[in-house]
């Protein structure tokens, strides 16, 4: 079997918002890589046996900070690529000079490649459109480095060591705004580091199945199946590896999208023949949420009750030794809790660090090394439906945070119908995959309406659709008025409890994507 970790690249993180993008681009060219804090122990770096090292960008100023690349990075004899801050500290640590730029540079820029033979710019044209994001610049390269690219505002836009395979770029090749960024990453990983492109879905599936079998043996495994992307792919890979040793518990909270519970059972229990226990807990959730209007309180109640019900069902399964979870690599990175990290943790993750202290089951995380886009590709490779894998994100508490205030059965049913119409029309008009997330929100206020000759006094549905790359910021989707008119007419005519439909035109910031 191919060892997919045999050729790998180590990424040292200086706190850049783009560090995970670097890792994703390296993996896209077929090379495994991992991210670690810049101040990780020297012995770890040495024992990692990387074929190459990438130094990320960062928010600090090189000449104001004592944050530097570990000297061992430059002593191992492996290629090094410094990006933005990574380039600046590498040059400075080799006798160069960095100063604050007269003018910060954020956005697209044109760089001119001065030397491209057998370096990171191989096979690229002289003029390249790139993405800059820096306030400092290299003013003197020192005796060891030479300039291999320049731009109007950054005369030292890229450097190469005169005798060692060390390279630096002031711009960000990992972003999609740098038109040939992937080629630059590929040149470094494959041509300079001499990595073989072993990291692909076929090899990952083969490797994961072998590792799961080795880890689990003949033990039984329990998985909480939600119908979301991560747990669905975990179910598929575990079933492929250990068959009927897997038991999935699907807690139907009643707060899912219209008919979603039936769809989950159809895909996994009927189509894939996976052992799934469906727990109809709709009434328990409604009872627990009665009279509760505070969003945070609703989240806590839903989360705790979900765990309680899961535990009740798990206790009934004899000889279970493992609990499988859909933890993915971005969860691991963002929940690492590294005190030296300059990157801000945007949110806590339900998949990491939330396990009961008294849990006696061992933890199995087959997706722990994968980013979300890799998880989706893995799911396709395992035969899961495209529409299941590429659905818009859905919050853990479900419709519980899309119904403002108290949750009632009538409100849930109303929102499910309205939301389903919105989604159906997005698919019908080929708009669904052009936007990042779209859903309905139930507003517990009534509005006067007229249908035919009848006066109606019913509820309001807000439609929300956004476009985003990373969901940390988002713009509202500029959907055609004709389309919105069709959706609005259908909802008001087909959902009797709704008399008015509004469209949310708030970006993030200042708003959040979800209303609660």
UniProtKB/Swiss-Prot annotation:
Active-site residue list: 84 (nucleophile), 172, 174
Domain GMPS ATP-PPase, first and last residues per copy: 199-391
Catalysed reaction equations from the record: XMP + L-glutamine + ATP + H2O = GMP + L-glutamate + AMP + diphosphate + 2 H(+)
GO molecular function terms listed in the Swiss-Prot or TrEMBL record: ATP binding; GMP synthase activity
A Pfam family of this chain: GMP_synt_C
Keyword set, alphabetical order: ATP-binding, Glutamine amidotransferase, GMP biosynthesis, Ligase, Nucleotide-binding, Purine biosynthesis
Superkingdom classification of source: Bacteria
Domain Glutamine amidotransferase type-1 per the UniProt entry, residue ranges: 8-198
EC number(s) stated in the UniProt entry for this protein: 6.3.5.2
Annotated signal sequence range: none
Quaternary structure and interacting proteins, as annotated: Homodimer.
Protein name (Swiss-Prot/TrEMBL): GMP synthase [glutamine-hydrolyzing]
Organism field: Francisella philomiragia subsp. philomiragia (strain ATCC 25017 / CCUG 19701 / FSC 153 / O#319-036)
Lineage: Bacteria, Pseudomonadati, Pseudomonadota, Gammaproteobacteria, Thiotrichales
